[in-house]
Amino acid sequence: MKPTIPGEVGEKGHEIEAIIDRVKLGDKQAYEMIIHQFERQMYTYCYYILKNHEETEDAVQEIFIRAYENLHRYSRQATFSAWLYKMAYHHMMNIKKRQGRWFELIHQFKEQHPKIEITPTPQESVIEELLTYLTPEERHILLLKAVEQYSFDEIGDIMGIKPATIRKKYERLRRKLLDYKRNKGGIVHGTFAKSN
């Protein structure tokens, strides 16, 4: 069962829709309430894709700017958060494409300018290790399913892929992670043990 997304169900859902209506009518300050409501979710999602705090902050800001500019296109066929995640997904894919083009230059820069390493917590290390083992598409699916707990239908809508395909991809990546951790002698978090 999908947990309650703040501002998306019952009275709160109507509240978000009312705020969106105010923004569409020109109340720019009302948009700050939308940002406040969804900023943390967007940051978490983007960070696990980009793995860099500064890039994540920039990406989140760009996503909210694009959402504001395209709010007139939002139709209530999906929840606002699903619409926002769809926008975030496409933005992350564009960033990853750009990063791919500049990978060699960045790699050279990092070799010339080593940074001070901060020791991550054991849990952060496991998450980081698992995410680096996955493709960008698999990371998106995993984060939307296991962290944000969207249904396969919602993930399919966000990513523009059939829900049945998302389910198969999720099962494959789940098995991939389980095999990886078994081979490494570790334990995989219970979230990956079963799909819903």
Predicted regions and their residues:
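Short, charged helix-capping/linker segments at alpha-helix termini
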Residues: P3-G10, K24-M33, Y43-E62, P163, ...
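Internal acidic/polar
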Residues: K12-I16, N94, W102-L131
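Structural recognition of an alpha-helix C-terminal capping motif at a helix-to-coil junction
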Residues: T44, D58-I65, E69, A78-H90
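Helix-turn-helix DNA-binding module
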Residues: T132-H140, E148-T165, K176-D179
